[in-house]
Amino acid sequence: MVESYDAVVIGGGPAGSTVATALARASRHVLVLEKEKFPRFHVGESLLPFSLPIFERLGVAEKIRAAGFQKKFGAFFWNDVTGSGTRPVLFSDALDDGHPMAYQVKRAEFDHLLVPRWREFESQR
């Protein structure tokens, strides 16, 4: 018997896991295709405050807070050509979204928090 799906998501990283969770939460039958074996090393560990409301909607914000990732309150930009940098830019000064900080995450641990979430909803189908 061939199983059918409402959606096939290519990639199980943060974007793929987020889409899969949103779809599964809406009672869609989801298949996630990922060629890599988890946990895995991957770049992309610097989150921005805009991502925090998404994690709240997905129901993983508390798990992310509890994981103990480094809090990040802003950024500093460096120019290798001129050898100079900017003054620190605080998220609370630059963004007006009610989230003055974000996290610097270890991707293998971060992915491990996200991937099981869509499976939880999928298993409730």
Residue ranges and their predicted role:
Residues 8, 24-43:
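Glycine-rich FAD pyrophosphate-binding loop
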Residues 21, 25, 53, 116, ...:
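Short, well-ordered alpha-helices that flank and scaffold nucleotide-derived cofactor binding pockets
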Residues 15, 19, 38:
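Conserved Rossmann-like nucleotide-cofactor binding loop
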